[in-house]
């Protein structure tokens, strides 16, 4: 059974938007959380509603607990019950323990770990008996640690652990799984050449196809024998000794 009543954080752009498109279809309802991407969210809403979906946009800053709590309340009001939560949105800034500061720490931990925890808790209150899923978008770096992106890495390793422990807590009525992507879309700090060097340094020497991530989401939803698993979908980057920090490549 496919998901029918879905929440996607960071669903207006990049990986989140691609997942929304993958899961959309006739009678599918999706709440898309955005923060700074309203225009892109509106365009996506129009596109997906042409496929027969009902799309609801909500602005929320995942660093603010009051904003996070209103997402599930909004979704419940619009859709009744819920059956799928995709914790996709994240803050991704570079810091190191040597220049630790509370602002960066709080931004990452609040948006990338605390928000998914709150959303998962609230989501669990509004599901029916059946095929219910939480899918956390993590990062391959949880399998291949480096000292870079200090606060981000800690937030994602926390989300990795939460995927495992919440799968135990929410079973059998909610399955919880995660996807740990590698180099998929160039970020704003990277040049095209840096991004190319990054994915060419993976064992498969290829950029992660965003459709592969979407297909993995679909796989987790449909396969009712899987919970508590995190799939490294990274062209083998987590196996690699040629990580960006070794090669001197910007991330």
Question: Where are these predicted regions, by residue range?
Answer:
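Substrate-binding pocket helix/loop in short-chain dehydrogenase/reductase
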Residues: 96-97, 104-109, 198
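Conserved Rossmann-fold SDR core element
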Residues: 81, 160, 170-184, 226-233
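Conserved glycine-rich Rossmann-like NAD(P)H-binding loop of the short-chain dehydrogenase/reductase
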Residues: 28-43
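Conserved glycine-rich cofactor-binding loop
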Residues: 12-14
